Amino acid sequence: MKIDKTFLLDKAKVCLSPNSSERKSKEISLLVIHNISLPPGKYGGDYIEKFFTNQLNSDDDPYFEDIIDLTVSSHLLIKRDGSITQFVPFNKKAWHAGVSIFKDREDCNEFSIGIELEGTDETPYEKEQYNSLIMA
């Protein structure tokens, strides 16, 4: 995979999130890998995409009531089948790390790339996810 001139992966599905902003610095020095599943422990569907684009419907699952007002995103989502969706170009700040500090530097979103793996802390990831993570 290659990053094109618009800072998007050439083989990723693009679903741009409004939950991003310009970076103050161009230096990227941190990769943050998270996991997510919506509803928790359930895989497939488009709830993560809806969540990152502020289109989640709280009537679809009781859990969504707790997160409906959050405005978050990541640069990439790698689903269980290894497919990649990009929400924020790499030259912009995705809102994935919240209030954060790494090596005495605050606001990790400012100098990091955020990648979400569809999954949970308790469930092993799929081989396809690891392969896509390596390729990205």
Question: Where are the model-predicted features located?
Answer:
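Active-site-adjacent loop/helix surface patches within enzyme catalytic domains
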Residues: 2-24, 30, 37-135
